[in-house]
């Protein structure tokens, strides 16, 4: 960019002088309309479990979650993203509980849509909450995650959620071809209006630790890793190829995960494809901000709002954030 004019004729501070002019020239704005609130749901009645590594975040049974959903609706938050905490007795090598029509997720989806039909409900399509080994797919005898065999289970899982009333299914597993397989399954069953939010650029990040504690998969995964299917944090061009493939297979929206450490990817995706682009402010990002605020090192409100503004400035149309309720309250003034 070539600057026009010379100092003192050109003074950039002139438009920064007063609040009204700063507001008039503001390029990016955060509103409650961009928030998706991730929630952890567990079996039982009246149950609340604090997530130690995520201060302020709780695992909630359905009756408690309904109260949380009501608060979200009243604050104007458009959607919740559900993540189940599955009892260890239901975790198997074949992840059969993932497509149980009477399972936790379909029951929660049905209840949420019955009570709050205007609230968007997004479900996670992946097998790690359901496998005894904590991987996102089926494995062979060596522990390698099997791609094509996993697709069949993911398709059943997505259809199970759609038939329960999920507005959006969000495959986060990073198997090749899963968007096309899921779209075909949904279409064949007549679920043509179920949207797919593809975790297209999901990196094998170190920032997921608290989330795995929250859903109870950390212990199952142990010292294992997800390098053979999640993306290398060093790569950017690969992310564009992943997004292009998912869109060609039938994705309606795409996701970049994690968020703040990968805002360069958000910008590249938005510039290249100009499709609905979402980013996830993941558990590790949340935990870092919370820890700094609790130690008095950062102003929590100011830093949370600035971090969310960074997502918008990078090109994100929506943000999954554990700060959604707090941020919505902040924005009310």
Regions found by a protein language model. Give the residues of each.
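Alpha/beta enzyme core
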Residues: 2-7, 18, 31-36, 42-333
């Amino acid at each position: 960019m070539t600057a026009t004019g010379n100092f003192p004729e050109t003074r950039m501070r002139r438009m920064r002088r007063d609040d009204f002019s700063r507001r008039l020239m503001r390029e990016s704005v955060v509103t409650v309309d961009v928030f998706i609130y991730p929630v952890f749901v567990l079996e039982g009645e009246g149950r609340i479990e604090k997530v130690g590594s995520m201060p302020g975040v709780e695992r909630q049974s359905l009756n408690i979650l309904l109260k949380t959903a009501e608060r979200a609706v009243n604050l104007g938050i458009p959607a919740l993203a559900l993540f189940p905490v599955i009892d260890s007795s239901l975790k198997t090598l074949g992840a059969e509980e993932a497509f149980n029509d009477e399972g936790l997720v379909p029951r929660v989806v049905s209840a949420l849509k019955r009570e709050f039909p205007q609230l968007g409900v997004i479900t996670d399509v992946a097998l790690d909450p359901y496998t005894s080994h904590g991987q996102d797919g089926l494995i062979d005898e060596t522990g390698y995650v099997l791609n094509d065999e996993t697709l069949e289970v993911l398709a059943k899982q997505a259809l199970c959620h759609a038939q329960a009333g999920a507005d959006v299914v969000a495959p986060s597993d990073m198997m090749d071809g899963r968007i096309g397989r899921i779209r075909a399954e949904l279409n064949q069953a007549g679920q043509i209006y179920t949207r797919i939010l593809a975790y297209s650029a999901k990196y094998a990040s170190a920032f997921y630790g608290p989330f795995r504690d929250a859903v109870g998969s950390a212990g199952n995964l142990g010292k294992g890793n997800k390098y053979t299917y999640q993306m290398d944090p060093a790569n950017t061009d690969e992310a564009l190829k992943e997004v292009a493939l998912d869109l060609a297979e039938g994705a309606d929206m795409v996701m970049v995960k994690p968020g703040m450490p990968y805002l360069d990817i958000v910008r590249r995706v938005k510039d290249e494809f100009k499709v609905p682009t979402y980013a996830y402010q993941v558990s590790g990002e949340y935990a870092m901000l919370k820890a700094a605020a609790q130690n008095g090192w950062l102003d929590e409100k100011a830093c949370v709002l600035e971090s969310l503004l960074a997502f918008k400035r990078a090109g994100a149309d929506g943000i999954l954030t554990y700060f959604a309720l707090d941020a919505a309250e902040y924005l009310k003034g």
